[in-house]
Amino acid sequence: MTELFRHSKHLLASLALLSVLGLMLAMHPSPSAIERIMARGELVVLTRPSNTTYYEDQHGFTGMEYELAKGFADSQGVELRILESDDLSYIRYAIRKGTADIVAAGLIATPERSKSLRFSTAYQNVDVLLVRRLTSHRITDLSQLNQQTIAVSAGSSHAELLLKAQLESPELEFQEVENATPEQLLALVEDGQVDYTLINSNSYTLQRALWPDLVADYTVARDMPLSWAFNPKDDKSLYQEAQRYLTQAKADGTTAKLEDRFYGHVEQFNLYAARSFMRHLDDRLPLYEDLFKQAEEDSGFDWRLLAALAYQESLWDPQAISPTGVKGLMMLTNNTARQMGISDRTDPSQSIRAGAGYLRRTHARIPDRIPEPSRTWMALAAYNVGYGHLEDARVLTQRQGGNPDNWQDVKQRLPLLAKPAYADQLRYGTAPGGQAVAYVRHIRRYYDLLVWAENSRRRDDTLIALN
């Protein structure tokens, strides 16, 4: 009886202790997901390096996903830390294990993925395109792909689309390639290892000129939502904050401005121009690459930006000459050559050095309060149309209620300089401002292509073996 009484006392004491602990936990609950982020002072975002998400250019890290994630981190008053992976399986594992707070990797929110991940509202919608060689058979329906070789990245939304298509066309077969990037899959098609692959329309838009022998003329799926992914086991505090941010970003034009920044300079595809660029990338650029890299050290500009400028000016032809007398790789005037202290405009070394130096001098005149990349795009416009005319465009931008320190606003006013009704009210008069806008757009396009041609090392490193 005494022993039973002793056990009862222990049981009552344990129950009392548990009650106290329960009360303490109720009074001091575990911090929420957003509170944990605020406490550590950083937001951890997992992404895939690509031209549509996250990459490095002359101004540092950038990309549509990166800029959105950076904006969200800033809105919460915390630092942004980026983790990278090309492995879709690891990405899903990492978010569920808490390795990252958010996945911002250009993921399409599919019904299958939504079973294991919590997705935000879409920040962008894309089409899924079927890519083939120009010499391959054009299809009008997926059922026509029977007996054709198709490769997609393993575990991707593209694989899900093809699995769904198999329900209606059981003979449709495809291969899933582990951790394959879009560039690797495009290389497989170009080299004839497979007949087709799938690609998101935003990715194809940015790199189409790198693959002039490929075409995407069949749409597999339309308006697929690109979304951020969250751990469904977490409370919804972080998710709700992200939802508010993305909704506001759409409402206040932030998302639209980012789309214009990353896609607005991509002009209509020109097959001849693309093939010429790829040919010159192989047979001309290597002759001058070291000179551009030396100019980078001297000027501080990314050598690929200088190379893009030179391609716009001369197609990397040191003997190029215009009807107005400008000549050389950087197409310098006699006056500019004298200013920069060179004697032979057709000498590649002198021309590149002088062109880079002149761009640096022009860039230094742009007010340093103007953030990048707007400051560089304005410097390029001034390089083309003259600094005074650029300043006129900025004055006009301010008069019309725009931001004179933002390239997106200024480029809308530059074409107005050609109209006397506007130019007569400005200091420097009329100018071909629309030409300057096109000039900057072309250079940005060539620069993007050079960055991605190098980053993906498509010539040697993107060819992968199929299982």
UniProtKB/Swiss-Prot annotation:
It catalyses: Exolytic cleavage of the (1->4)-beta-glycosidic linkage between N-acetylmuramic acid (MurNAc) and N-acetylglucosamine (GlcNAc) residues in peptidoglycan, from either the reducing or the non-reducing ends of the peptidoglycan chains, with concomitant formation of a 1,6-anhydrobond in the MurNAc residue. SMART domains: PBPb. It comes from Alcanivorax borkumensis (strain ATCC 700651 / DSM 11573 / NCIMB 13689 / SK2). Residues 34-266 are annotated as: Non-LT domain. It is a peripheral membrane protein. Murein-degrading enzyme that degrades murein glycan strands and insoluble, high-molecular weight murein sacculi, with the concomitant formation of a 1,6-anhydromuramoyl product. Lytic transglycosylases (LTs) play an integral role in the metabolism of the peptidoglycan (PG) sacculus. Their lytic action creates space within the PG sacculus to allow for its expansion as well as for the insertion of various structures such as secretion systems and flagella. In the N-terminal section; belongs to the bacterial solute-binding protein 3 family. In the C-terminal section; belongs to the transglycosylase Slt family. The N-terminal domain does not have lytic activity and probably modulates enzymatic activity. The C-terminal domain is the catalytic active domain. The gene is mltF. Residues 1-33 form the signal peptide. This is Membrane-bound lytic murein transglycosylase F. The keyword Lyase applies. It is found in: Cell outer membrane. Its main location: membrane. Keywords: Cell outer membrane, Cell wall biogenesis/degradation, Lyase, Membrane, Signal. The active site is at E313. Residues 268-467 are annotated as: LT domain.
